[in-house]
C-alpha cells in the first residue's frame, strides 16, 4: 500500500496562474476558506514526529479537509518565504514524488504556479492544476494565516505551454489551503497547514483521504526542514 500511496500525491502543495486567467475564487471557495480557518470541527486522528494530524468534514463535500500542525520557533517570515518559493519546490519538497512545479508569474502580493502530478498506475490519468497563492490572510479579518492559496480555472492555451505531453490529464479546479501561524504565550508559534482538494476521478474516498494525509504530512515536514536550513544560514 505504501508504494501505491507514493505514486499518488493529490494534495501536493499546490500553487498558480497570472493575468488573463479567471480565478475560481467564488462563493464556495470563500466558504471553504472559512471552514479551513475555523478551529471548531477538527477531529484529531494521529501524531507523528511531533506533528498532529486532524481531519474535518466539509459541508456538501464528499471528502474531508486535512490539517497538520506543530509548535516551532522558526520565524513565520522564513516559513512564508519558503512556501512562496514556488520555483524551487522541486529542490526542497523531496518527499512528495516526481511532481513538476513551475512559477508562472509573480506580483508583490501573489504568485501564480502550475503543478503536474504523474500517476504511474493503469486507467488513472495524471493530474495537473494552476493555482494562485497570496502571502497573507484570505480576508481582512484573517490575521493568523501567513499564506492562502486556491486553484484557478483551466486554460488549455496556458497548459499546453507548460506540459505538452500527449496523455489523458485530469485538471483539478476545486481546492484551497491555508498556512496559519498562531501565537502562543512562549516564543513558539503553532504552525498548521490546512487543505481541501478534490483529486477528481472515480477513486474510493477512503483511499483518497489516506493519500491526502500522507502527502500533506510530507509537504509540511519538507517545508519546515527547508525553513530551518534558511534560518541557520541567517544566524551564521
Locate the predicted segments by residue.
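Intrinsically disordered, low-complexity regulatory regions of eukaryotic regulatory proteins
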Residues: 2, 21-24
Amino acid at each position: 500500500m505504501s508504494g501505491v500511496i507514493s505514486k499518488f500525491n493529490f494534495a501536493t502543495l499546490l500553487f498558480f496562474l497570472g493575468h488573463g486567467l479567471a480565478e475560481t475564487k467564488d462563493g464556495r471557495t470563500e466558504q471553504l476558506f472559512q471552514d479551513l480557518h475555523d478551529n471548531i470541527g477538527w477531529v484529531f486522528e494521529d501524531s507523528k514526529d511531533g506533528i498532529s494530524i486532524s481531519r474535518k468534514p466539509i459541508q456538501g463535500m464528499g471528502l474531508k479537509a486535512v490539517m497538520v500542525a506543530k509548535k516551532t520557533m522558526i520565524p513565520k517570515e522564513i516559513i512564508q518565504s519558503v512556501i512562496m518559493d514556488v520555483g524551487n519546490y522541486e529542490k526542497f519538497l523531496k518527499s512528495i514524488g516526481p511532481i513538476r512545479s513551475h512559477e508562472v508569474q509573480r506580483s508583490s502580493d501573489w504568485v501564480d504556479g502550475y503543478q503536474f502530478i504523474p500517476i504511474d498506475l493503469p486507467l488513472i490519468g495524471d493530474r495537473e492544476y494552476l493555482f494562485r497563492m497570496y502571502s497573507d490572510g484570505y480576508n481582512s479579518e484573517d490575521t493568523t494565516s501567513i499564506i492562502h492559496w486556491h486553484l484557478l480555472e483551466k486554460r488549455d492555451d496556458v497548459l499546453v505551454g507548460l506540459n505538452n505531453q500527449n496523455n489523458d490529464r485530469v485538471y483539478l479546479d476545486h481546492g484551497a489551503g491555508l498556512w496559519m501561524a498562531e501565537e502562543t504565550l512562549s516564543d513558539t508559534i503553532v504552525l498548521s497547514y490546512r487543505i481541501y482538494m478534490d483529486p477528481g476521478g472515480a477513486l474510493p474516498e477512503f483511499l483518497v483521504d489516506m493519500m491526502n494525509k500522507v502527502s500533506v504530512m510530507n509537504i509540511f515536514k519538507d517545508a519546515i526542514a527547508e525553513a530551518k536550513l534558511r534560518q541557520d544560514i541567517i544566524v551564521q
